[in-house]
């Protein structure tokens, strides 16, 4: 994980992180087993990286520069261009392997499923985003 400058982070940006950990701890795979602690920690690290990126690269859909506005759930509704800048741009400069990027995509998908299942994001929006994430 990279160094985090806490001065740019806002408490509300990471509001769902503790709940997401609980969600992962209760997650059951198709064979009925849960996720290992190592897998949960990897998902948490990947999602924290994604949220950090989102909080420091909060692009307004009408502009090409970062906003000064703290992020809220609206950043999670961004489209394919936003994911492209994260997965194809930022991650390629910070990870050495495509496997790491695939793992990050899987973690972000789990995070969106969590947001959908807990009613934090509308089902139609989450389904659309999850469909877009299939490209990665």
Language-model-derived ranges and their functions:
Residues 1-10, 135:
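Intrinsic N-terminal pre-sequences and regulatory tails
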Residues 3, 26-29, 87, 94:
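Generic signal for short, ordered secondary-structure residues
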Residues 5, 9, 68, 118:
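Sparse, context-dependent recognition of short Cys/His-centered cofactor- or disulfide-binding micro-motifs
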Residues 8-52:
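N-terminal "first-domain core" detector
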Residues 15, 19, 82, 86, ...:
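Exposed alpha-helical structural elements
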Residues 23, 86, 90, 132:
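Residues that form generic nucleotide/phosphate-binding pockets
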Residues 33-117:
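Non-catalytic DNA-binding core/recognition domains of DNA-processing enzymes
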Residues 60-66, 117-136:
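Short, charged hinge/linker segments at domain and secondary-structure junctions
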